[in-house]
């Protein structure tokens, strides 16, 4: 028998303590428990509180862990994270299989409601304006391998397809090495999404990845408030859908999330995007809804024809081109390139969302949306306490320690030179405004002072 007083305890990480305080002020746990209550039944084994489930996924973002197994192991290994989850010293942390069961139980609509609740928290902190929206997309690596692709019709494998082509080319009973050489040298090689799919994840699409390779992926699209860097909409779509078409759904989702978060009519007035989103039909669609577009135009190799296009298309195209050429349009494009890309860097690169370990577009969307929630919470905390991730807290503490050491070193040198304490502060403040260290002292003191 070991008394609980003898068990190891942790004072908790200051960053996670600040995050818990923010969630407690907004009554986050009570809100998500009210939403999830109809999905749980009375009796049976005690379930994991919804607040603990969301906190564990938040930890995946803040610690840069992409898999649920890694999150479960990290939570069980760290006393400070156990304190963040609100677990007693004698309680065990949830298993990764429990996270899977809860994710499958919660519908996507419920996750979207929690996402809107986090936007409400940002609005109450005056971090949500929703006037100028930047839109961009990136690819997410799916949990599917190219070597296992099969035909959409018939389910034939890639090896069987190559064997048939090799026999037609005159190679009887080809070996695996001969098939690889034949596949490497043959002309007109294509792998179309219309013909091939992954047997383990049919929703994934074949596309070109960020590193130049070809693989199965999804497309994640962000709509970011360019004034505050809050992500107001994030959804996962098939990777083969064009940006000019998916932006419509993203703008509609962003408008609905803003209305739900602010509890009032909050109209988007400007949409900024790169040239991948330049489609005249989309420009007209946005203009009909009172939204000014700042979409970078594509470089046309030949003169465009407008006599076969509907009325208003040419005017929408030219108005967008004029707006992007002005100083305001260039400034908004710089903001988009900086802040929207930064959201992808935080969520996908350092947040662990670039590689997904779940399958199906709905499950991937739910998992990704929770990661974007954590990103928005990090933006709020960066405004309140100056840091948005635990790593930033450690680097800031090191910076403050360096400044304090520099302060003490300067004070020690000046006191040793015989200066009064009152002159110390004024001299040091004066030196901050100069490009070099220079002390106006007597020749005797100057000779004995080295700085």
Q: What function would you assign to each model-found segment?
A:
Residues 5, 44-47, 87-89, 344:
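A short, ordered amphipathic alpha-helix with a cationic face
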Residues 40, 60-61, 83, 103-106:
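Short amphipathic alpha-helical interaction patches enriched in hydrophobic/aromatic residues
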Residues 66-76, 87-451:
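Anion-binding and metal-coordination hotspots
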């Amino acid at each position: 028998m070991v008394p609980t007083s003898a068990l190891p305890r942790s004072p908790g990480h200051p960053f996670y303590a600040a995050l818990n305080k923010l969630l407690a002020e907004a009554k986050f746990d009570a809100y998500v428990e009210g939403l999830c209550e109809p999905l749980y039944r009375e009796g049976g084994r005690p379930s994991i509180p919804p607040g603990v489930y969301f906190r564990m996924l938040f930890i995946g973002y803040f610690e840069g862990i992409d898999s649920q197994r890694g999150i479960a192991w990290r939570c069980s290994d760290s006393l400070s994270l156990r304190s963040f989850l609100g677990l007693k010293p004698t309680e065990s942390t949830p298993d990764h299989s429990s996270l899977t069961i809860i994710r499958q139980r919660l519908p996507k609509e419920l996750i979207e409601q929690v996402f809107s609740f986090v936007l409400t928290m940002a609005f109450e902190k005056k971090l949500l304006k929703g006037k100028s929206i930047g839109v961009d997309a990136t690819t997410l690596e799916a949990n599917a391998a190219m070597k296992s692709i099969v035909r959409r019709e018939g389910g034939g494998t890639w090896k069987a397809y190559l064997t048939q082509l090799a026999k037609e080319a005159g190679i009887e009973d080809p070996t695996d090495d001969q098939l690889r050489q034949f596949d490497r040298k043959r002309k007109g090689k294509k792998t179309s999404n219309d013909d091939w799919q992954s047997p383990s994840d049919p929703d994934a699409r074949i596309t070109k990845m960020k590193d130049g390779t070809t693989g199965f992926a999804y497309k994640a699209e962000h709509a970011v408030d360019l004034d505050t860097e809050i992500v107001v909409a994030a959804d996962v779509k098939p990777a083969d859908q064009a940006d000019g078409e998916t932006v419509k759904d993203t703008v509609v989702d962003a408008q609905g999330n803003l209305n739900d978060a602010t509890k009032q009519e909050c109209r988007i007035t400007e949409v900024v995007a790169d040239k991948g989103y330049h489609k005249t039909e989309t420009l007209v669609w946005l203009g009909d809804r009172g939204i000014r577009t700042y979409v970078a135009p594509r470089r046309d190799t030949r003169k465009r024809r407008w006599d076969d296009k509907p009325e208003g298309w040419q005017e929408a195209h030219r108005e967008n081109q004029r707006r992007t050429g002005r100083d305001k349009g260039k400034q908004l494009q710089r903001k988009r390139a900086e802040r929207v890309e930064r959201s992808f860097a935080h969520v996908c690169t350092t947040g662990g969302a670039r590689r997904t370990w779940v399958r199906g577009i709905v499950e991937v969307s739910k998992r990704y949306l929770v990661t974007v929630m954590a990103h928005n919470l990090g933006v709020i905390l960066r405004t309140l306490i100056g840091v948005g991730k635990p790593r930033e807290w450690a680097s800031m503490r090191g910076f403050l320690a360096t400044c304090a050491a520099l302060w003490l070193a300067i004070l020690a040198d000046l006191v040793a030179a015989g200066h009064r304490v009152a002159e110390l502060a004024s001299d040091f403040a004066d030196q901050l405004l100069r490009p070099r260290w220079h002390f106006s002292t007597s020749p005797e003191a100057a000779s004995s002072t080295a700085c």
